[in-house]
Each structure stands twice: as structure tokens, then as C-alpha cells.
């Protein structure tokens, strides 16, 4: 999902945040396609350490909570991304060490020069 130089595939995917889509249809609100229910655009991971809260609805305040979701909080639905349901198992199992290493890597994607440039501050 988070590939290429931008660390995104620019696609819409269901990442298992919701299982009830009655209030939030995702991409299908625009496309009207049933296969788009619960799908949201995959964001870039550039500067991800400084862009929380995370997910389309701001559900997670920290990167740690995002990884915990992917490890043990994924909700199943008909449009769930197949990468999150391998061999009938939901989520992406990660050890504590893998989570720490992944967060350390994500922090390296922060462009300190960009975020400190006054021309881009609000």
C-alpha cells in the first residue's frame, strides 16, 4: 500500500477500521459502487510522525495505536483489503521489536527542513 517514493499507491483501500458503514460509506459515497464501501485513500507516509491523528476519522492519536490496530484490531467486512486477511487471519502480526523498528523507520520519513520552513507554516 505504502510503496513508491511517496510511500503510497494512491488507491482506496478498506483497512479494517469500521465494520458498520451506515454512517460512513467511504469511497462509495462518491463512486456509488458497492465494492468501494469502507475504502479510503491510502495516504503518504512522508512526515507521518508529525501528522496525527491518524486514519480517515482521526481514531488513533499515536503511531503505536495504529500499529496495534493492524496487529489485533482489524475488523472484517466484505471489502476488507486482502492484505489484511491472509490465510483467514485478520491483521498483520507484529512483535514488540518489529513495532519499535517500524516506528523508528517511520520517524526517518520526517523532513525536518520542510516542517520547520516558515513558508509552509500556518
Feature-to-residue mapping (PLM):
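Periplasmic c-type cytochrome electron-transfer domains
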Residues: 1-122
Amino acid at each position: 500500500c505504502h510503496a513508491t517514493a511517496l510511500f503510497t499507491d494512491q488507491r482506496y483501500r478498506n483497512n479494517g477500521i469500521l465494520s458498520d458503514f451506515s454512517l460512513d460509506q467511504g469511497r462509495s459515497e462518491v463512486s456509488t459502487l458497492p465494492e468501494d464501501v469502507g475504502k479510503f485513500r491510502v495516504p503518504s507516509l512522508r512526515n507521518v510522525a508529525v501528522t496525527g491523528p491518524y486514519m480517515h476519522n482521526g481514531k488513533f492519536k499515536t503511531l503505536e495505536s495504529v500499529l496495534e490496530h493492524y496487529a489485533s484490531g482489524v475488523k472484517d467486512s466484505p471489502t476488507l483489503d486482502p492484505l489484511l486477511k491472509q490465510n483467514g487471519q485478520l491483521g498483520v502480526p507484529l512483535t514488540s521489536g518489529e513495532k519499535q523498528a517500524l516506528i523508528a523507520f517511520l520517524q526517518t520519513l520526517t523532513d525536518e527542513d520542510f516542517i520547520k520552513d516558515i513558508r509552509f507554516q500556518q
